[in-house]
């Protein structure tokens, strides 16, 4: 983000109309129960960071603040980062990714991907040199408990992706309402589009196939 800030400042000095934005990836899932979390967070593995409660001082889910203020896990860990940026004069405009999904801003890109998953698969496999799972699909629905993990896609008819989850429940995900998300390789360019991003510094890990 500091590289982005330097580019923004340089662009402004050159007379360009530039703005620094920071996309908050709070639609991404909780990967595991980290050492600072209570074991009760086990139930939230696979759930989106912007949709689960933040930990309290004991590492337990702070349900009261989540229900009263909407203070999420993502908010909790974003706050000190933003404060540190503010101290050095960096104040980007924030774009919560989960909000963008829920507002339907990913709908057009999601439709393009879901309408032709074979083309997406071919590109990823050709560029990366690896084979995707046979059940791979370019949309990750939320299951019956709100997790992105353990689902099998059973069908697609715009705007609905049909699924069966690990609990044996069947359901459908509306790609226009953010009832799931795109895999990161598709999420990334999609948000460039509707956020009008023209430049984004990134690490070599993101540049790898």
Q: Which residues fall in each region the model found?
A:
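N-terminal Rossmann-like or analogous alpha/beta NTP/dinucleotide-binding catalytic cores
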Residues: 1-121
